[in-house]
Structures are given as structure tokens and as C-alpha cells.
């Protein structure tokens, strides 16, 4: 309920154990929602979505693919911040676009609000899911609860992990209720996801984050750092 509220409401949450599992859930949901024949997920070069075979295939870093090739089919990569390239990659086989609000492993590249809005527009026009991978950026780290909240967009699916359990292994995949309804009984499950220990840790973590206004503190720290950097010659 807390996560759904922080994401604007109207969604459902599936708990897992790691960011990769949350992204696997999101991409399986996209295929189930879109139906047979629409199995391709588009991501960007420089992205990082996990180390399982599917999330590694979605990761847009060919050097990471080499030792484990061939990669599973169904993943397509486009240039970062290039809406024209993204549009050209969308055909009748695509079900979703997965994007990080800030690329971490790709070199710390923030997505401009206009870029995220453009992705939302393309997803609406082509009937695709917009998946936000907030594993690294979520839960206050960017000055908002989630990185996409710096832009005027409403994703269909949001994944998160890392900060959620404050060191305890828990992740979550949030989806709009009408999207989550695509999963049928038996489609997706986990043995340890959502167990009492980890969810209690996540609930306590979120309570502290809200009580101490972690997003506000991140905004303040970011402003101090930006101000100091701007005083340096040549920066």
C-alpha cells in the first residue's frame, strides 16, 4: 500500500528478492499483456537491467554478453536519448520499452524530461508498455521518490530494489492494475519473495524514509554539490 501510494495509486505490487527478478517480472508481464507475437522488449545501449539471462539480454552492453552468448531472443537495443532511433526500432513484435531514469553503469546519464515524455508518447501511440527500471534510482535517491517523477510521465510498470530493504534482499515490481491483470494464476511466482522478514524490513525502511524526508535531503545535498562544482573552473 505504501509503495502504491508513493507511485500515485491504482497499481499492484509483486515482491521478489533482487532487481533482476523484478525486471524479469516486468518483462514477463509485458509479454503476457501484449500477447503472442509481441515478445520484443526495447532497451538502450549503455543500460543495465540485471545478470540473469533475460535481464542480461535486455542490458545494452555487448561486452557483457560475450562470455554467455548467444543471448536469448526478444531484446532490441537503441541509442540513448534518440527518439528517432527508438521509433524506428518499434514494429508489430514489440511489447514494451524498458528505460532507466538515470543510466548508472552507462556513465551516469540522466534522461531529460522531454526524452521520457517522448517515450511515453511512442508507447501510447504504438500500444506498448513503458517500464521504468528504478532499481538504482528509486526511493528518494534523486530528490523525488522515483526518478521518473522529475518528468511529467506516468509509467505502466516500475521496478525497484536496493534501497527498498536497506540491506535486506527484497525487490518489487509495481504495475497499473489493468496491466497486472494480464498475469493469470500460475504465470509468475517466487518462493521467498514477500516473506514476513523482508517485507517488515521494507516497511520500516519506508517509514524512516518518509519521517526523515529522504527525497528532500537528497535534493538539498544535490544542490550543495552542484553549487560547489559550478564554482570549479572549467566545470
Describe the predicted segments one by one:
Residues 1-235:
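Conserved N-terminal phosphate-binding loop of PLP-dependent enzymes in the Aspartate aminotransferase
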Amino acid at each position: 500500500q505504501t509503495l502504491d501510494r508513493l507511485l500515485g495509486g491504482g497499481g499492484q505490487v509483486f515482491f521478489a528478492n533482487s532487481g533482476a527478478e523484478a525486471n524479469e517480472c516486468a518483462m514477463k508481464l509485458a509479454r503476457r499483456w501484449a500477447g503472442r507475437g509481441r515478445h520484443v522488449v526495447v532497451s538502450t545501449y549503455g543500460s543495465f537491467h540485471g545478470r540473469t539471462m533475460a535481464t542480461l539480454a535486455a542490458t545494452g552492453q555487448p561486452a557483457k554478453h560475450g562470455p554467455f552468448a548467444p543471448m536469448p531472443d526478444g531484446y532490441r537495443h537503441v541509442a540513448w536519448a534518440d527518439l528517432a532511433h527508438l521509433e524506428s526500432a518499434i514494429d508489430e513484435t514489440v511489447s514494451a520499452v524498458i528505460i532507466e531514469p538515470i543510466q548508472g553503469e552507462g556513465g551516469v546519464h540522466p534522461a531529460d524530461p522531454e526524452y521520457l515524455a517522448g517515450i511515453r508518447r511512442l508507447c501510447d501511440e504504438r500500444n506498448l508498455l513503458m517500464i521504468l527500471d528504478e532499481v538504482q534510482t528509486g526511493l528518494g535517491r534523486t530528490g523525488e521518490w522515483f526518478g521518473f517523477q522529475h518528468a511529467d510521465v506516468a509509467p505502466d510498470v516500475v521496478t525497484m530494489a536496493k534501497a527498498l530493504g536497506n540491506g535486506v534482499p527484497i525487490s518489487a515490481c509495481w504495475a497499473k492494475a489493468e496491466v497486472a491483470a494480464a498475469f493469470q494464476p500460475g504465470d509468475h511466482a517466487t518462493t521467498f519473495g514477500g516473506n514476513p522478514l523482508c517485507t517488515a524490513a521494507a516497511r520500516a525502511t519506508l517509514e524512516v524514509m518518509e519521517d526523515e524526508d529522504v527525497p528532500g535531503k537528497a535534493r538539498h545535498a544535490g544542490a550543495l554539490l552542484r553549487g560547489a562544482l559550478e564554482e570549479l573552473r572549467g566545470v
